[in-house]
Structure formats: structure tokens, C-alpha cells
Design a protein with these regions (language model features):
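Bacterial N-terminal signal peptides
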Residues: 5-15
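N-proximal helix/coil linker or "cap" segments that precede and/or mark the start of modular domains
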Residues: 14-33
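Thiol-/selenol-based redox modules, centered on thioredoxin-like
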Residues: 131-178
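Short, internal strand/loop/helix patches
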Residues: 84-88, 102-132
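A short beta-strand-turn-helix
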Residues: 35-54
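Structural microenvironment flanking redox-active thiols in thiol-disulfide oxidoreductases
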Residues: 53-56, 63-107
Length: 178
């Protein structure tokens, strides 16, 4: 049992091969105006719009989580604190009796907060692709500007960086309200 839980959680944090896909045509173009879930430390985490930053939202289930680092590492290196990077885990398939174990494993494996969606309602509302990393670029209003799913590769990371750059440049061009 411990081995199964360890394997489940190990795959929640770490690259599998699949070509990234662009956003399907029937997916929403706006994120919910507010998402509030608890993280692995049982602290409430809130993502609400309008906000102040460009947000990179990663969404994954057990298998898709293996692909997250391939996206987040180069984006964090390039953009640093200029973007808000948030993680959302689909843990809706975890049986209720194992939730505490999963939460504790998450605590040991991830030092940054990851929103845990036990019901699956939030990930469903965001129309994520199961078994793949899902990466969404959201502007300060919560509009989904770019959506990619699958494993990162140099071209897909470059495309995502270009989308983020466009948002940051457009935001810098607009005069701030005084």
C-alpha cells in the first residue's frame, strides 16, 4: 500500500513523451473569476481576477504531473517574479481514506503551495486534458490567452514565452490609472 501511494505521489511531482497540443476550440476563454482551494498544507489558496500579474496556471493529474517541471523550470528562469506561477492538482480520483496520506506526501515533495482539487470541479471547469501537463497563460483579467498540454519541448516553451512576452509588453504599454 505504501508503495502504491509513494508511486502515485512521486508521479504527481516530476517528463513523459507527447507532443504539446494547442487549445481545443470548445474550451473556455476565461478562467472562473475566483478559484479557492486548499493546498497540501491545508492552507486556503485563492486565485482571483482581476489580478495584477500575468498568471501561468499549471494543471495536472498523477500522470500529467511528470511533465510540469519541463514547463515551469525554463519559465521561472526567464520571467522570475514578473509572472505568477500557480499549480493545480487533480486529485479527484484519490479515495477519501487515502487523502491524508496524499496530502502528507505532497508536503514532503513540494515546498511551494499546490491547490488540491479533490472534487475535480475546478479542473473540469478549466477543461484540462487528463494524463498531460496543462499550461494556461492568463492575463490580469483572467482571460486564457494561451493553452498548451503535453510534454514541453524547446519550440513549445519558446511559443509559450512569446505569448507571455506579448502580454507583458502590452501591459507595459498601457498607462497606469492614477
Amino acid at each position: 500500500m505504501k508503495q502504491i501511494v509513494s508511486l502515485l505521489l512521486l508521479t504527481l511531482t516530476a517528463g513523459v513523451s507527447a507532443a504539446p497540443n494547442s487549445e481545443p476550440s470548445s474550451t473556455p476563454t476565461n478562467a472562473p473569476s475566483s478559484i479557492e482551494l486548499h493546498d497540501q498544507f491545508d492552507a486556503p489558496q485563492r486565485l482571483s481576477f482581476p489580478g495584477t500579474n500575468v498568471t501561468l496556471l499549471t494543471i495536472a493529474d498523477k500522470k500529467g504531473s511528470e511533465q510540469i517541471a519541463g514547463w515551469v523550470t525554463p519559465l521561472k528562469q526567464r520571467f522570475g517574479k514578473r509572472i505568477d506561477i500557480r499549480g493545480l492538482a487533480d486529485v479527484s480520483t484519490v479515495p477519501r481514506p487515502l487523502r491524508g496520506i496524499v496530502r502528507r506526501k505532497f508536503q514532503r515533495l513540494q515546498t511551494y503551495p499546490v491547490m488540491l482539487d479533490w472534487s475535480g470541479e475546478v479542473v473540469k471547469a478549466l477543461t484540462y486534458v487528463p494524463d498531460r501537463a496543462n499550461v494556461l497563460v492568463l492575463d490580469a483579467r483572467g482571460q486564457i490567452l494561451k493553452r498548451i498540454s503535453g510534454e514541453a519541448n524547446p519550440k513549445s516553451v519558446q511559443d509559450l514565452c512569446a505569448a507571455i512576452d506579448r502580454v507583458l509588453v502590452n501591459r507595459a504599454d498601457k498607462p497606469s490609472a492614477q
